């Protein structure tokens, strides 16, 4: 299967970078008048539109030989990240936590010792900003760890309370979580010792849910946000936003609006993207919160629009028409929204599994994503075609495949991960191969960044019937870009 993508700019039409195998950028003079070759370079605006690289910190790069990925390891690999063309990094949680994934903090103001020190984080930020790479942090405030001091103190208080009613004057943390009696038969509620008290934990008993009705909790979270923004963080990825009040979208939207308003009052240029694992209709409602971005789950994963198109289950023009419909709906909810398309992340199977190791489909999918408006997110190792295995989370978070020979920078896999043999070559090998998946991603990102209309523009599809192997998309933003997809065997 061959994919050809042709791009012309109204004010700057010319031959663009040739992409290997299935993404070819060629002159499109027959479609637009006045096309002429040019060598002018398009400068990418320094704004919130970025190409993000998601890093699962413990699995990325080990700087000190302890076989755990760390912050200094990321700093060491910034040249690789910059060379790929990424202009933003999303770090999965780095705060102290008893679990390998760190999605349950015991301290919102620290760095997990396995990842390094606060000085290491500050160095990483400094080096990112030198390269004009923005860094956003994963912020988990649906819940904490059951080992968090707030929770431990509240539980200790309730166990000793007897028949009295809780009093915040005696223990301020008793209102930080969702505590109640008579919940023995209620799903996701867990008993505190042998007392009559229970607490809510939507994900599991080790992650007690915070009470976001509490003004004290919100003040705590505002202080947390201020702390990291003042350190230099460029924004946050908000975990599990639809579980703040499980089953109550309006309340969740209010929380997002409160947090977005507060963060922008501290740092107006900060960027927020939230995880709301839902379909298009629900996402449109959540955009009414005013948040910058929501991850585009309808585009992602095996049954998402990108992979369906890559597998020829829908036509290119159907894909483009879907994109237009989605942008129109989301802009009605939030005219300033920034889409956040992705193919895979730390909770999903990797692209290699979605495409059953079909290299052309994987490249096609990457090319499609890089033609979508907004800020695309690429999961570390996706640019290599790294494998996952089955549905076990640990298998989705395997060590970055830097080299087949030199394993000095390769962390150990999560403890319960299965042994998975990678099908495609390491980063070291793919960097030397002009036809590799890595080079395809790199070229696709370069194409996107050299045509800023793609990320920022208003999109439409021209009228008229097209053959099933052709798709045409018009993007308008300070000029015009016409993208044409042609698929052939």
Sequence positions of predicted segments:
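Positively charged n-region of N-terminal signal peptides that target proteins for export
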Residues: 2-4, 9-21
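Loop/helix patches that line or flank the sugar-binding groove of alpha-linked glycan CAZymes
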Residues: 266, 278, 324, 336, ...
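Structural recognition of the beta-strand scaffold that forms the well-ordered cores
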Residues: 52-54, 88-92, 137, 237, ...
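A structural motif
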Residues: 86, 233, 374-375
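Active-site-proximal helices and loops of the catalytic beta/alpha 8
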Residues: 125-129, 142-143, 148-168, 224, ...
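Residue-level detector of conserved catalytic or cofactor/ligand-binding positions
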Residues: 485-489
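Hydrophobic core
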Residues: 23, 27-31
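Acidic/aromatic-lined carbohydrate-recognition and catalytic surfaces
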Residues: 35-218, 230, 241-289
């Amino acid at each position: 299967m061959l994919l050809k993508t042709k791009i012309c700019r109204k004010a700057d039409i010319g031959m663009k970078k040739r992409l290997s195998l299935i993404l070819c950028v060629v002159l499109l003079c027959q479609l637009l008048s006045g096309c002429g070759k040019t060598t002018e370079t398009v400068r990418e605006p320094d704004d919130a539109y970025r190409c993000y690289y998601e890093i699962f910190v413990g699995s990325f790069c080990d700087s000190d030989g302890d076989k755990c990925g760390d912050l200094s390891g990321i700093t060491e690999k910034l040249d690789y990240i910059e060379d790929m063309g990424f202009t933003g990094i999303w770090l999965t949680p780095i705060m102290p936590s008893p679990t390998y994934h760190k999605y349950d903090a015991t301290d919102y103001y620290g760095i997990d010792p396995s990842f390094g020190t606060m000085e290491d984080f500050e160095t990483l930020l400094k080096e990112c900003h030198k390269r004009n790479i923005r860094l956003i942090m994963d912020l988990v405030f649906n819940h904490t760890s059951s080992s968090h001091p707030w929770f431990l103190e509240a539980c200790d208080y309730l166990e000793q309370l007897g028949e009295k009613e809780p009093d915040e004057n005696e223990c301020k943390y008793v209102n930080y979580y969702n505590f109640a009696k008579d919940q023995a038969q209620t799903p996701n509620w867990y008993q505190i010792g042998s007392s009559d008290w229970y607490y809510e934990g939507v994900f599991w008993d080790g992650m007690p849910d915070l009470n976001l009705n509490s003004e004290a909790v919100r003040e705590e979270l505002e202080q947390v946000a201020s702390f990291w923004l003042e350190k230099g963080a460029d924004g946050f990825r908000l975990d599990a936003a639809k579980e703040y009040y499980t089953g109550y979208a309006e309340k969740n939207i209010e929380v997002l609006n409160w947090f977005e308003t507060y963060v922008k009052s501290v740092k107006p240029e900060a960027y927020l993207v939230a995880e709301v694992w839902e379909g298009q209709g629900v996402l449109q409602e959540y955009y009414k919160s005013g948040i910058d971005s929501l991850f585009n789950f309808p585009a992602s994963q095996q049954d998402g629009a990108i992979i369906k198109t890559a597998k020829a289950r829908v036509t290119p023009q159907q894909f483009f028409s879907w994109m237009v419909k989605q942008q129109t709906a989301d802009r009605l909810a939030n005219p300033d929204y920034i889409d956040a398309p992705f193919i895979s992340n730390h909770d999903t199977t990797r692209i290699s599994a979605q495409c059953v190791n079909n290299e052309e489909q994987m490249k096609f999918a990457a090319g499609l994503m890089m033609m979508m408006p907004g800020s695309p997110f690429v999961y570390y190792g996706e640019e290599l075609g790294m494998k996952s295995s089955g549905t076990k989370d640990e298998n989705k978070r395997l060590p970055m495949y830097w080299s087949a020979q030199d394993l000095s920078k390769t962390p150990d896999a999560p403890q319960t991960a299965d042994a998975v043999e990678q099908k495609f070559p390491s980063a070291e090998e793919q960097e030397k191969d002009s036809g590799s998946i890595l080079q395809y991603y790199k070229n696709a990102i370069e194409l996107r960044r050299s045509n800023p209309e793609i990320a920022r523009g208003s999109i439409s599809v021209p009228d008229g019937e097209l053959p099933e192997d052709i798709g045409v998309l018009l993007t308008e933003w300070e000029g015009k870009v016409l993208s044409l997809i042609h698929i052939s065997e």
